[in-house]
Amino acid sequence: LSSKLNSRSPAFTRIELVVVLAIVAVILVLSWPAFKNALTKRDLTQTMNNGRELYLAAFRMATDGAANSDSNLAWPGDYPVNSLAEYSSRLVEKDYLKPADLQRMLSAPSAACTVTATGSPVTTTLTGKSTLKIYKVKRTDPSNTIFAASSNYIYDTELNAKVEPFGDAGFIVVRKSGDAGVYKKGQATAAGYDNNAARFQAEIGALPGATKGEVASGDGATVLAGPR
């Protein structure tokens, strides 16, 4: 009798192992969406922090320019530049950011941007995809003007699930005041604020040069061109 029981034990062990593995697989499948969502929220928060760090460098440069009447130190919209690379050159040349720090700020797991700075005066080259885009904010723009946003967001436009980074999982905005936030897809347009344009501009932000209480979809020419 003992020999029969011993001969069956390995079989029972294998069956139990298969059952346990099947249960684990089911748990993993069911928990994956929540796990993926948690990772995305983490990456969005990190991107928001990176955007605010970039904002602080821009703020210091513009403030120094205003204090010293130096037009070489200004907000992005007060320069005759049209690309993020050109504006980045100003930040690096004036030593408000190091190339390695800028590269970290402009990158995310699904959007890596490589920053190369050469020459004197410094010329900065950006390759890949920037996770952040910078708006042409001017000294005269109000504090709720958008300074930066994640690259998947187009002003007052629904998020596209196919656009990296983050798809339609959410987006980030950093305003000229320094306030920043992570937002859900339902907050991407004025429709998410009962089509109250003034409220949308107050909570998400306004485009550079925008009229208070008037919202137009799209970024238009208000964004510095990113790497291609």
Q: Each PLM stretch: what is its role?
A:
Residues S31, T47, S69-A74, K98-S110, ...:
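A structural signal for short, well-ordered beta-strand segments and their strand-loop junctions
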Residues N82-E93, T127:
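Well-ordered, non-membrane alpha-helical segments in soluble/globular domains
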Residues I154-R228:
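C-terminal accessory segments of extracellular proteins
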